[in-house]
Each structure stands twice: as structure tokens, then as C-alpha cells.
Amino acid sequence: MTVLRIFRKAAAAFSGLPRRSAGRLPLAALTAAVTFSAGALSPAAADTDFNRWVEGFWPVARDAGVGRDTYRRAFQGVTPDPDTIRLMNKQSEFVKPIWEYLASAVSDTRVEKGREMLSAYAPQLAAIEQRYGVDREAVVAIWGMETNYGSFMGEHYVVRALATLAYAAPRRKDFWNRELVTALKILDAGHVQPDRMEGSWAGAMGHTQFMPSSWSQYSSDYDGDGRRDIWTNIPDALASTANYLKRHGWQSGKTWGYEVVLPRGFDYEAVDEEKTIAAWSRLGVSRPNGRNFPRPSDDAVLILPAGASGPAFLMLRNFYVIKRYNNATAYALAVGHLADRVRGGGPFAQDWDKRALPLTRSQAEDLQTLLNRRGFNVGAADGRVGPATRRGIRAYQRSVGLIPDGYASVALLERISAGR
């Protein structure tokens, strides 16, 4: 198994709550683990029950080394967070097409702001790049994606949000308990004051949205002041992000991937396969405008995020490292593209085919059910389009003379629903 395949496997398995931004995962990842009826108790009864839970949680925090005074300050006046309860029970059926996602995530405004941040923090970013071996543009791109360069870091008190999840969630309680304890230990150590410990409804914090456990493992005290302050100290936050990427295997001096052009008659059975770039070149895969690949020996995976009619990409290991930050392909592609644009690059060469609409989760379940009925075994109909579903789609596409790109589109569902 090559190193890149190991990273792809790790990224594919990284479908639980991530290291820093649980609120940015597809919400199904949370709602599968969390269901709570806000109307089950009256507000007064819920608060009373929650207060008992807080007192009952104290021994857990104490045994982890949290001081009693810190615990009291952290929970002073805290009640269950209704926004957290509402959001953790919400499951969006709508799926934004990747071209709409990218248009927002890599907007001209965000690109220009990223270039400004690259200039404003040039000395610090140069030092961070030297220390961790991670491209400064990639670090700035994640900052832009996560909080729009610090303009919105979330408005939830992290202890309140995590306590609500630890109290209300019927599953994954150990996860939420650990995150809450770690947040309390951060307060106890004086890295941030309670009134500044704000983040997402799921507890992701700071400029680049670390979960408390990830803060504990990867945060960096860039300026040596004794605090790892990802909330108000921008260099600390950027260094922490670089450290996270480095620790997950970032390859220094290499890019995340390349937009590529596929030749006429290309064998789409090779989609999702890993080969050296030299091997892809022998199959006729090239870069737009005749540009060369700088390192033909690099391993790369061919992906088609919107099928054969949209842009194609060869993804290198750093792409899968970005996916350890957020496991969505669209997110990692946006980070890579934003980094390139901030560096001075242009938009993608090929336009997106806006007719190639993606499926909602319920539509994906329908497609999986129909494929299974037709004998194209894709496993459980869970609405998640993974490797097994793409293999089944390709087998169906081959059987009816379509390009076997494995893309789960509305048009494909309509065709198979009609019995064709």
C-alpha cells in the first residue's frame, strides 16, 4: 500500500466528528449521533435537570485536574444552549452543487482578502512556513474558509455548547465529555478567559476552528508568551493550523493537486485509481494550456467531483491531509483552490456543467435501492455515496452504454427510475 493510499484510507475513515470544526461537517454526521427533543421538558425542568447534571459532572472534571474555582466560573449562569439543541437536531436535505459551493468559498472578495492577510502577516507566515514546512497560502486558505479570516468565529460559549451536547446527546457521550473536560482544562491553564472562549455550536474554537482535543494536541504558542491563544492571537492560530497539517503528513514544497484535461477516448475505469503522474501522462492526462507536471514520480488519484462533464483533478497527498481538517471533497478542493488563487493563480480552466445536479441524501438512498434491485450491489442504502456506490454506478453505466464516471446525479437517478 503506497503512502498516498494510506492517507486516502485514513481520510475516508475520518467521517466522525473532526479535530476542529464539527459544525462544518455534513450535519448528518452529528444528527446520526445526536437526537434530542427540545420540547421534552419545560424550560424550568430542563434547567433544573441540567444543573443536577453539572454538579454530577464535577467529579469527572476534578479527576482530570480541573480546579473547583475554574469549574464554578466556567458554569456560572450556564443553561442548556437552545441553538445547539436546535442545530444538532437539524438535518439539511438540500445539497449545494459543488460549483455553487466553490463560487462562495473562493469568491473574488475572499481571494482579495486572503492576499491582504498574506501581506499583513508576511513575517509571521514566513516563519511559520519555515518552522512547519507548510505552505503559507494553504494556512491562510484554511483561515479564510473557517472564519473568513477571523470575521466570524462563532458566537457560542464553548463550555455551554459542549455541556449541552454532553448532557443531551444520547450517543457519543464519551466524545462530548472529553471535549468538555479539555475545554475546562484550557480555561484552568489560563490560555483564554471564559468570556473569550467562543466558537461554533459544536465547540469548534478560534480563528481556524479547533475542537478542544485538537487544541490540546496541535496548538502552538508562536510568540512564546506561555499561552496557546487561537482566539485573539492570530499568529498562534496560524501556527497551530500549520502544525496540524504537518502532524498529519503535509509534504513540504508540494501542491495539493492539479486540474487536468482527459484525452478523447479516456478509459473512465481509471477514475479514483492511484498512479504516478508519469503513468497518468502515458494515458494522455495533461494539464491545461500545455503546462508540465513538476514531479512525474508523485503519486496522484484522479477524481471527477461532478462527473465526466466537469473539471477533472489529480489529487496528491496534501489534498488528503486537508481532508483530515474536514473530510468533504468540496471543502478540500476549495482550500486548495483558494490557496492557489491567493498565490496569484487563476480560476479553473474548465467550466462546471451546471446540469449535472448532485443528489440529496434521500435521493441517494433511492438510487442505492434501485441499483441493488437491478443487481448492482452497493451495500446498504444509507444515502452516502462512497466507493461501493460509485462502483455500482459504473457497472450500471457500462451496462447501458453511458460513460462510467461513477457520478451520482439527478439525471442518473431519473434514468434508472424510468427502468432504462
Model-derived features with residue positions:
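Catalytic glycan-binding domains that act on GlcNAc-containing polysaccharides
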Residues: 66-297, 310-313, 321-339, 343-361, ...
